[in-house]
Amino acid sequence: MWSLKIAEGGGPWMSSLNDHVGRQIWQYDDNGGTPQERSAIDALQAQFTRNRHDVRHSSDSIMRFQFSKDNPLPPLPLQVKVKGHEQLTRDIVEKTLRRALRFYSTIQANDGHWPGDYGGPMFLMPGLVITLYITGALRVILSEQHQLEMCRYLYNHQNNDGGWGLHIEGHSTMFGTILTYVTLRLLNQGSGAHAAMEKARAWILDHGGATAAPSWGKFWLAALGIFDWSGVDPLPPEMWLLPYILPVYPGRMWCHCRMVYLPMSYIYGRRYSSPLTKLTSDIRNEIYVVPYEEVNWDSARNDCAREDLYYPHPFLQDLLWATLHKCVEPILMHWPGSLLRQRALAMVIEHIHYKDENTRYVCIGPVNKVINMLCCWVENPNSEAFKKHLPRVLDYLWLAEDGMKMQGYNGTQLWDTAFAVQALVSTQLLDECGSMLKKAHHYIERSQVQEDCAGDLRRWFRHISKGAWPFSTRDHGWPISDCSSEGLKASLELSSLSGDLVGDPIPAQRLYDCVNVILSYQNPNGGIATYESTRSYAWLELLNPAETFGDIVIDYPCVECTSACVQALAAFKRKYPEHRSKEIATTIRQGSMYIKNVQRSDGSWYGSWGVCFTYGTWFGIMGLLASGETYSTSASLRNACSFLLSKQLPSGGWGESYLSSQDKTYTHLEGDEAHLVNTSWAMLALIASGQVERDPTPLHKAXVLLVNAQFENGDYPQQEIIGVFNRNCMISYSAYRNIFPIWALGAYQCKVLGH
């Protein structure tokens, strides 16, 4: 039986800065669980499979089942449902909150964070399985049970037409389908032994075969040895030898972009292809519409299925790749040009090792994690670097009733915990949540980054880190502007509470360090991006080679990061008014100007990291309020509130489809369904802006929805996918289903009913 292990190490090849606090891995025990418990898990899995085309998102039922044994649910107040035109009372809302808090306390890990599913993208696991197959480590790292659950996951998320999408709710794409098909074959699923595999192969061939895969798909197929490198657009490692002053220099790109193309360029530069085996030879024969020997590889370079085309290549880009492919690469592949290639490869692998070591081999994300691991093996199959990579694979795997998936990060630990603290404090029910806050404080304190990366930061293209907070764990360590800000906000909230209740506050100097990082992020336009200040120009997007994603080349400022930083600095300024007061005031003022400048004509803001306009508008409103704007004095705030009110559904809630993110147009969920997380974001924004003084009716209607949606055990339902990145790929934030209804009802109880 599977069990979730928290804050445990993984043997002599692993290191940690804080005793693995935040690490979450799933382990299988052949003798674990009673027959009744195993039967209960089987029933959860079977139920998901039965409903898989209607309910795409898992509910983290296996984790919840484990916690129900480890942390039994305490007695709950009697549940109250509001009927008809009954009014909400403080008593009803308080009972609902106490029920929610008591349940929420049962799913908190011992180290203080709340574990949860961060899956959704379908293109992550294939890279892992392909890499492990190439390196011969597939069955070393992935037990038979791992492989069984991975297959379960992939089959569960196959669309009716036989294909797989970019993410679990998306339409079928060649990227999702061909990589998933290859993955299942590498996991010993026969091409014709399963009807699902037959349908998948038919989908691939009906849509043009392997040559119609987008560039990232072609890369993985070429590395596996079933696609010719001459059919892949160039990824020259020599780009890293260019001077930094050039806008196209990779070190000036968004860190996620450069961290993926850095190891890709190493594999491409070496033209590494895994030797064919009987299995990969069979796969190669199954995925092309013409015999492999007859494929026109030059034509294949520019081929991409229309289902995958979110960002078609401009002509300028195709011309550049053709020139590099036909004129430059032949020179670099032969002496004396090969001398330059060897120098570039040496520089690239040096950077890869630096990145690995500074994240304890977690790496910044799952895509570059597995390509970095492949590079280390290609360089030296017996290297310590490769051995250090292997145990960290488990950090990315998550199990739910839909199977085992590869997550979009090694978790959302700090991010969710910082939000959770603010949600818990909003309820003012400290008698219920004191223990949770104390454990959460422990997690936040242990997860702060307390040093910059080693060496010359400019040489390694790293931003300062000391004092920041990461998205997940300290061992991961990449600092992010909004994570630092939410970590700072949570720390300030905790410092205002009794030390006897939550523990000693984080020392002021460490908060000063965080402020120093936040101040360093602001760009000349007042906006703040994610990991670093913006280093190059938006026109560089013309060179975006990834047909499936938008806005990936540079680190763009966004309303969420800017607002989070403004809110954090304003909160810090209230507690420490003398510390760098002029710089903080300037940053807040310029951030506020940016927020107003990027507001859309309808009053909304586009959310880059959540679905979508509801999320962005919550941040936009909160940022302007933190900067000192008010509803009566700010047209921006009035327009934003009008936008939110215009999208409220007859049910009292808000419900926004992921299509809003993809199409950049507000789109309701199918059937005008309300989403509890969208509803909570809208409530928080409207409550903060003073809606209770104008007309509290919309807030009352929304709060009734949240009260009535609560389960008997105090939990809330998992609904449609609510996270997004790069405009077109959706991702799960499973903890939001608890955090935001608690936060919204807490604010409603104290600021609306208590008004």
Swiss-Prot record:
It is an enzyme of class 5 (isomerase). One of its GO terms (cellular component) is lipid droplet. It catalyses: (S)-2,3-epoxysqualene = cycloartenol. Its EC number is 5.4.99.8. It comes from the Eukaryota. The keyword Isomerase applies. GO terms for biological process: pentacyclic triterpenoid biosynthetic process; tetracyclic triterpenoid biosynthetic process. CDD domains: SQCY_1. It holds the Pfam family SQHop_cyclase_N. PFTB repeats lie at residues 97-142, 147-188, 390-431, 511-556, 588-628, 637-678, 699-740. The active site is at D482. One of its GO terms (molecular function) is cycloartenol synthase activity. The record marks W415, F471, W609 as: Transition state stabilizer. Pathway: Secondary metabolite biosynthesis; terpenoid biosynthesis. Keywords: Isomerase, Repeat. NCBIfam families: squalene_cyclas. Belongs to the terpene cyclase/mutase family. Oxidosqualene cyclase involved in the biosynthesis of cycloartenol. PANTHER family: LANOSTEROL SYNTHASE (PTHR11764:SF20), TERPENE CYCLASE/MUTASE FAMILY MEMBER (PTHR11764). This is Cycloartenol synthase LCA. It comes from Lycopodium clavatum. The lineage of its organism: Eukaryota, Viridiplantae, Streptophyta, Embryophyta, Tracheophyta.
